[in-house]
Amino acid sequence: MQRESFGSRLGFILVSAGCAIGIGNVWRFPYIAGVYGGGFFVLLYLFFLFAMGVPVLTMELAVGRASRQGAVKGYQVLEKPGSHWHIHGYFCIIGCYLLMMYYTTVSGWMISYLFKFLNGTFVAGMDADAIAGVFGSMLASPGEMTFWMAVIVIAGFLVCSRGLQSGLERISKVMMAALLVLIIALAVHSLLLSGAPSGLAFYLIPNVENVVSAGVGNVISAAMNRAFFTLSLGIAAMEIFGSYMSRENTLTSEAVRISLLDTFVALMSGLIIFPACFTYGIQTDQGPSLVFMTLPNVFLNMSGGRFWGALFFLFMTFASFSTVIAVFENISSFCRDTFGWSRKKAAIVNCLVVLAASLPCVFGYNIWQNLHLIGGRDVLDTEDFLVSNLLLPVGSMIYLLFCVSKWGWGFDAYLKEANCGDGIKLPKWLKPYFQYILPVLILIILIQGLI
């Protein structure tokens, strides 16, 4: 059977960027940037993004494009006879399932809040306790959380069942275009608020005092981690899109475009958050408390708050759902390639599997709220720890070693594939950096995540 392919270069870039752009761009990056020195952090982040993230992204894409296969089979096509690199492919799929076991729940929160702003659950004059109560009530209701999680899962597999070009590519183009329009509109609105100058100063102006206070080592570490994790590398989520892409452009050119689009969304998120928080004197935060308590409080303090709140959660729904459908495509592709299933069968079976597998995360906030797993973490944090702190860095290290070592695919074969087409070409003199320095940087991230 002939391998499907993207209908356009734009489609590939938007689908891949949609996979990278996620909740962390909004609820983690801006806060970390502000606390860890503003402009200093942003510059360090960009340095590590291009020094670490882009090279590993080209490697994952190269394995996919050269093999025209996804996880497992991509390794099998390229590895030397008798070697076992392909075993990592199975861990990639496990990582994708684990990621969806909690990401679908959090994505359900986004669409739930979109409807709460539309239906009048949030109204002007609500105080912080009432706003926090809405979030607490949602978490305490397994029925409500299961419903919205199921909406995300079913919608995601419906998109994938329609095919690559008719489903994933078409929907991603529309969502990503809408996402960019929404984030620009929200940022412009925030920049017109009275607290915009103070918010921008905190966010973007280099702050030596914050760097010293946080510790230079901690600032560098935070920039490395954020730059590495933002591209969702190490679990074949990008490899599958490499298997669908053309050979007309170099992989470095495409990786740079994906990374810049991801960075644009992260930076713009801060332009939404900080001017608004400084205008209304509300303490900034990160994580779920920022999105589901701090920002609703901000929106309800401003004129037309329900409208702006609805727009923000529509943006967040698109940001999270774009990641969901991208990872679903990887899972679906694995089942089609391994078991010979049709797209429709792969979508139906995986829809049922992910629905069932996502329930522990839902129940972890209510029925199983006293359940504590690795290091006392709840269900969601345990699943996130396994993916973010273990599978992503280990997987990235394996892709790196496969592409640069003589026991794997080999650096020359990787470089030939990466430089195929028009655009930015990687020079051969980078080989020592890829072989000796980049593995050390990834190892540092892995160790930091485990201690």
Roles of regions detected by a PLM:
Residues M1-W27, V56-L61, R65-L78, G82-I87, ...:
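Membrane-interface "cap" regions at the ends of multi-pass membrane proteins
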Residues Q2-F6, E169, K173-F321, I325, ...:
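Membrane-embedded translocation segments of transport machinery
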Residues R3-E4, I32-Y36, A66-F91, T104-Q165, ...:
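Inter-helical loop and helix-membrane interface segments of multi-pass membrane transporters/permeases
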Residues S5-S16, F41-L44, S83-Y97, T146-I152, ...:
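Select transmembrane alpha-helical segments in multipass membrane proteins
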Residues G11-F48, A236-G242, T252-V256, L260-L261, ...:
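Transmembrane helix-boundary motif of multi-pass solute transporters/channels
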Residues G11-I13, C19, T146-F147, L261-L267, ...:
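Loop-to-transmembrane helix boundary motifs in multi-pass membrane proteins
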Residues S320-A326, A347-Y365, D381-L415:
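Hydrophobic alpha-helical segments of multi-pass membrane transport proteins
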Residues L373, R377-L401, G423-I451:
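A generic transmembrane alpha-helix motif of multi-pass inner-membrane proteins
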